[in-house]
Amino acid sequence: MALIATKISSRSCFVSAYPNNSPTFLISKFPNTVDSLSPANTAKRSILRNVHASVSNPSKQFHNKTSLEYLHELNIKKIKNILSANVDVPSENLEMIDVIQSLGIDLHFRQEIEQTLHMIYKEGLQFNGDLHEIALRFRLLRQEGHYVQEIIFKNILDKKGGFKDVVKNDVKGLTELFEASELRVEGEETLDGAREFTYSRLNELCSGRESHQKQEIMKSLAQPRHKTVRGLTSKRFTSMIKIAGQEDPEWLQSLLRVAEIDSIRLKSLTQGEMSQTFKWWTELGLEKDVEKARSQPLKWHTWSMKILQDPTLTEQRLDLTKPISLVYVIDDIFDVYGELEELTIFTRVVERWDHKGLKTLPKYMRVCFEALDMITTEISMKIYKSHGWNPTYALRQSWASLCKAFLVEAKWFNSGYLPTTEEYMKNGVVSSGVHLVMLHAYILLGEELTKEKVELIESNPGIVSSAATILRLWDDLGSAKDENQDGTDGSYVECYLNEYKGSTVDEARTHVAQKISRAWKRLNRECLNPCPFSRSFSKACLNIARTVPLMYSYDDDQRLPDEYLKSLM
């Protein structure tokens, strides 16, 4: 029913992949051989180990904190100089940009990356280069919001529209084409075919083989970069670097140093934010008054960390965690606690924001609304002081919409009514809680707080509703109930089976998977220029969709273990 809340719910194989003129450095992504004792590998391990030691052990720092910061800035400046030096031949920066983004350190190089990709986009369609280069160019441009037409891949197709034999054993190129295909939008038949062909062909090439290269390919197929939250892609990427056995360019070593220091800083930042979140939740006191409701501040702040990933947005993440926590609590009130009559009154109170109407409600509902009012007022005052605009009305309306959607589902369950799939999804997109959370995120980012933009966000635009559809349907693919929930309600799968008599569960689940794929295509399209929203907000919408699969990785007890959540930080 609610956001973030579940209801019912060997080497020989690849030897032909590298043309003689292929770049030899690592991340082209897969080496021809893996030698964990190679000099290059030993050097890379040493870089990572020494940087970590210098940061984590004060007695082994270069001299003092200033020295470490100086070296960090020196490495950043070195990379910026390389990117700027290639300004007349921007395509030479593509591999470096891919590495920077894969390591999650693009915050330091935003201007240089934007300038490079903009220049490449202005050059128009480029059909020259091998498959890997073409697909990489396509992916990087689309990630930045540039609409590159799929016709760029015409040279790899034969006259019948199939893929030419020359690319069928190009593992490096096929892998990059697979990654690029995940940014396709509706109506792109060439990329639909590329996704199906590369997935099948790469599995075929890897069949019966055991190697690190195979493992990395299989990880890419299971977790394509575009649909995977950044923290996991950077960890996977660093792991690849550590065991790659090739001579890599000097700039890669500089990037590794930057990434390692950033990683250590981020861990410290995260620990501080989590400490503040736990303190806030304890002082709020809801855990005592709404005893059966979930108390999971670690999980709630994990969502905020993944949605707003810029390290400079600590205050915004802490504030976003607060409404996320209330989504969970109110969801449990509707699912577990409340009688239908009480839920109807509670919804009316939220809709009118009427404190007087609380008198007839039980204490846990009164306390919950008071917490909701306090959080909404706190956020509104902060935004008004910072930006001169009062978001109170918009925030209250989002809570009213959520509660009304919860109430609809409560009535369905109470009466035994199983809605049509269309009815279910129309309401489910709202009851997912994604719209409410993304409205808060938009306001907290403080970008373009104009009447027109806020009204657009309030209307649950495609960039938000697509992400909500992904969450709702992912939720319903799960067969387990969320932890600590005694209540139940219908799922899309149940509605489908009821509406399409004779269908099997497998057929229903296949249908759901197809709808998720279409929702991703719509979300991809919404994030391309011209987009009415900032890149930071577009990325936040992508991030919430990327985070969904992670938050449904339950253990045997249908819980998200704390250690698992900590590993995501």
Curated annotation (Swiss-Prot):
One of its GO terms (biological process) is monoterpene biosynthetic process. Its cofactor is Mg(2+); Mn(2+). Binds 3 Mg(2+) or Mn(2+) ions per subunit. The keyword Magnesium applies. Keywords: Chloroplast, Lyase, Magnesium, Manganese, Metal-binding, Plastid, Transit peptide. Mg(2+) 2 binds at D331, D335. Mg(2+) 3 binds at D475, S479, E483. (2E)-geranyl diphosphate binds at R294, D331, D335, R472, D475. GO terms for cellular component: chloroplast. Its EC number is 4.2.3.25. GO terms for molecular function: magnesium ion binding; S-linalool synthase activity; terpene synthase activity. Pathway: Secondary metabolite biosynthesis; terpenoid biosynthesis. It is found in: Plastid, Chloroplast. A motif (DDXXD motif) lies at residues 331-335. The Asp-Asp-Xaa-Xaa-Asp/Glu (DDXXD/E) motif is important for the catalytic activity, presumably through binding to Mg(2+). Belongs to the terpene synthase family. Tpsb subfamily. Involved in monoterpene (C10) biosynthesis. The major product is (S)-linalool. This is S-(+)-linalool synthase, chloroplastic. It comes from Arabidopsis thaliana (Mouse-ear cress). The lineage of its organism: Eukaryota, Viridiplantae, Streptophyta, Embryophyta, Tracheophyta.
